[in-house]
Design a protein with these regions (language model features):
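Basic amphipathic alpha-helical segments that dock to polyanions
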Residues: 63, 67-70
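N-terminal leader segment of winged-helix/HTH proteins
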Residues: 1-28, 128-129
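Short beta-strand "wing" residues that participate in macromolecule-binding interfaces
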Residues: 78
Length: 129
């Protein structure tokens, strides 16, 4: 074995400012990316227009940027089908599917605890007027 083959895998520490895992956390922590992961995980491959309809309020620019970031990071695949008009489908990769449970739980947690968060916000705002 060569010396380079014996080297341990690089260690990552997201608490360190220079760690590349921070950029990955920026991507998966983005609200549109997290919702895209859940939407694609629940419904399977979807066309751009279906994703746009599923995620109310997302602009074309943000949807496009989010999908490109996800594709670059290996979370989704983009498949073009030659037709009139061209059909483009997005699907989670196995790496993207590995995030599905976590993102689904986070979405469900937010939906379940929204009344408590709203009450806390109202109390905070009342105390800080």
């Amino acid at each position: 074995m060569t010396a380079s083959a014996q080297r341990p895998a690089p260690q990552f520490n997201a608490f360190a400012a220079s760690c590349p895992s921070r950029r990955l956390l920026d991507t998966i922590g983005d609200k549109w990316v997290s919702l895209l992961i859940v939407a694609l995980g629940l419904r399977g491959p979807l066309r751009y227009s279906e994703l746009s309809s599923q995620l109310e309020g997302v602009s074309q620019k943000m949807l496009t940027q989010s999908l490109r970031r996800m594709e670059r990071d290996g979370l989704v695949t983009r498949t073009l089908t030659p037709s009139m008009p061209v059909r483009v489908d997005y699907e989670l990769t196995s790496l993207g599917r590995s995030l599905l449970v976590v993102m689904s739980q986070l979405k469900e947690w937010a939906e379940l605890h929204m009344p408590e968060v709203d009450a806390s916000r109202a109390a905070y705002d009342a105390d800080h007027r």
